[in-house]
Amino acid sequence: MGRRPQLRLVKALLLLGLNSISASLQDQHCESLSLASNVSGLQCNASVDLNGTCWPQSPAGQLVVRPCLVFFYGVRYNTTSNGYRVCLANGTWAARVNHSECQEILSEGEKSKAHYHIAVIINYLGHCISLAALLVAFVLFLRLRSIRCVRNIIHWNLISAFILRNATWFVVQLTMSPEVHQSNVGWCRLVTAAYNYFHVTNFFWMFGEGCYLHTAVVLTYSTDRLRKWMFICIGWGVPFPIIVAWAIGKLYYDNEKCWFGKRPGVYTDYIYQGPMILVLLINFIFLFNIVRILMTKLRASTTSETIQYRKAVKATLVLLPLLGITYMLFFVNPGEDEVSRVVFIYFNSFLESFQGFFVSVFYCFLNSEVRSAIRKRWHRWQDKHSIRARVARAMSIPTSPTRVSFHSIKQSTAV
């Protein structure tokens, strides 16, 4: 351990020596360029800037163009571009050197790292926007008691599941350092289990959405007989034993790295991924049947309930592919092509992080019942405040001189 600081010091001294040798060679090269050039009159002397670019002897008032350096501090640059510097009219070099066109040539590893950082930013931005929209939608469903029915309670629980999933995503990102991954402590495994549980609940609540619509539209079963506890058992209850079984499998067969990722040849993750794919496929079948019925039997129907079903189906038609595409992308190999891999990373990051935003928009903000209830509340608030204003104005009108106040009567009786 004691030798490492000494080695670092030796390396630093060697680099310093090499840099000074390189700088002296550049100065000599710059002077030789200046001697070779024939410049008469007022001129700028040969100079090497901080980036190591040689600016040869040049006439005053001229913009000097020099190619970018091949290497600078170990970084390779594109030499087809140029740097610019002005030789001022008084024969001195301008302090500012324009190297904006000199772009570094990144290796494949550096490019992948840059794309990864951009994908992380997209993920953070998307999850922040999604969480904000989901919280607003949650509060609206909480406050608007007039629209509470089984259908909207399912929407509300789906939004709650997405809130919890987004919240645990932030916990994972902020706590799971490489050191924690390697230590495989108990709390980090619990965080992973919680994140996967809420991930599964998203799919089972989407299954609840499809199940409700299929029961109401295809089976023509009275929705009044449907109870919210049935859907609560499906959405929150069924995923729990699935995750418990997955956690037991991880504990015995793949107990490393906080249960993130998987060991080659171990398929414990399919314990929870399998049911997710299954309910996704069932939902696609439900949607196919629902759309078929709506297109044939209920096309001419104009009842308010049928209109609500159509709107719910439209929202589900949009959201289910969004949920499904992001999960099916997990099994897709983007290939070795650089462009396809970059597109895959960005596309998956965008859809994965903005899912909650789309759910809140389609099931809450564009929900006609929610919007109607908000308008009614707004009108009631306006009416209430206008009545208060009228009462306040009436109370502020001065009393007539002919009226006698109680205070004056009391004074006269006292006399």
Curated annotation (Swiss-Prot):
This is Corticotropin-releasing factor receptor 1. GO terms for biological process: adenylate cyclase-activating G protein-coupled receptor signaling pathway; cell surface receptor signaling pathway; cellular response to corticotropin-releasing hormone stimulus; corticotropin secretion; regulation of corticosterone secretion. InterPro entries: GPCR_2 (IPR050332), GPCR_2-like_7TM (IPR017981), GPCR_2_CRF1_rcpt (IPR003052), GPCR_2_CRF_rcpt (IPR003051), GPCR_2_extracell_dom_sf (IPR036445), GPCR_2_extracellular_dom (IPR001879), GPCR_2_secretin-like (IPR000832), GPCR_2_secretin-like_CS (IPR017983). The modification Phosphoserine is found at S301. PROSITE patterns: G_PROTEIN_RECEP_F2_2, G_PROTEIN_RECEP_F2_3, G_PROTEIN_RECEP_F2_4. The keyword Transport does not apply. Heterodimer; heterodimerizes with GPER1. Interacts (via N-terminal extracellular domain) with CRH and UCN. Interacts with DLG1; this inhibits endocytosis of CRHR1 after agonist binding. SUPFAM superfamilies: Family A G protein-coupled receptor-like, Hormone receptor domain. It is found in: Cell membrane; Endosome. Residues 1-23 form the signal peptide. GO terms for cellular component: endosome; neuron projection; plasma membrane. It comes from Ovis aries (Sheep).
